[in-house]
């Protein structure tokens, strides 16, 4: 029996993760999912990110961890049947919340149950380009903050061996083909 793959896309808003994760899921006939999830906790997180409700950054980190517990159950169930492609996962929490001032070790400790992805694609982009691409504004979309988050993602890429793809000057098709090229070289 071939194990199904858990593939994660990370990057700041406007990097192309949602577009690319959906394209890949369609091509692979995989289950597509995202964080924050559709759980009750995920809906609360979206309220906070939209600026409708305010909470402490540590509280937000805990909410993301709680949402991830529920989400991981769904991912594990789907992996029994097919590949899973996820738009954001644990590394978004580490990048965004640590830049917002939450201790990185705290974030990692409350997420220690998280499923380890088989592969993580980090899509990076010029900050100006990202801001032009973004359709919805949330509390994290400030230029200097996004730069710090992307820098943190690049640190995580070193630590966790992400595949980094710069989407700034590439078409959707070029990025998709690059992703497919990487996947062809992975035993599956």
Curated annotation (Swiss-Prot):
Q: What EC numbers are recorded for this enzyme?
A: 2.7.4.9
Pfam families named among the record's database cross-references:
Thymidylate_kin
- Keywords linked to the UniProt accession: ATP-binding, Kinase, Nucleotide biosynthesis, Nucleotide-binding, Transferase
- UniProt binding sites for ATP: 11-18
Q: Which Gene Ontology cellular component terms are annotated?
A: cytoplasm
Source organism per entry reads Methanocaldococcus jannaschii (strain ATCC 43067 / DSM 2661 / JAL-1 / JCM 10045 / NBRC 100440)
Q: Which SUPFAM superfamilies match?
A: P-loop containing nucleoside triphosphate hydrolases
- What reaction is this protein's catalytic activity? dTMP + ATP = dTDP + ADP
Q: Which family does it belong to?
A: Belongs to the thymidylate kinase family.
Record bears the keyword Transferase: yes
Species classification: Archaea, Methanobacteriati, Methanobacteriota, Methanomada group, Methanococci
Protein name (record): Probable thymidylate kinase
Q: What's the superkingdom here?
A: Archaea
Name a biological process GO annotation. dTDP biosynthetic process
Q: InterPro entries, from UniProt?
A: P-loop_NTPase, Thymidylate_kin-like_dom, Thymidylate_kin_CS, Thymidylate_kinase
Provide the GO MF annotations for this entry: ATP binding; dTMP kinase activity
């Amino acid at each position: 029996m071939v194990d199904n793959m858990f593939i994660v896309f990370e990057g700041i808003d406007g990097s192309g993760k949602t577009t690319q994760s959906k394209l890949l899921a369609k091509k692979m006939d995989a289950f597509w999912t995202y964080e924050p999830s559709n759980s009750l906790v995920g809906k609360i997180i979206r309220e906070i990110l939209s600026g409708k409700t305010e909470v402490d950054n540590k509280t937000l980190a805990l909410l993301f961890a709680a949402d991830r517990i529920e989400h991981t159950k769904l991912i594990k169930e789907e992996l029994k049947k097919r590949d899973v492609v996820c738009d954001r996962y644990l590394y978004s929490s580490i990048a965004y919340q640590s830049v917002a001032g939450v201790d990185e070790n705290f974030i990692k400790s409350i997420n220690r149950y998280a499923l380890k992805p088989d592969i993580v694609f980090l899509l990076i982009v010029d900050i100006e380009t990202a801001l032009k691409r973004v359709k919805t504004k949330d509390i994290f979309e400030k230029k200097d903050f996004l730069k710090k988050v992307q820098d943190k993602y690049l640190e995580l890429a070193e630590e966790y061996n992400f595949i980094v793809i710069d989407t700034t000057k590439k078409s959707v098709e070029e990025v998709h083909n690059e992703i497919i090229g990487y996947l062809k070289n992975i035993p599956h």
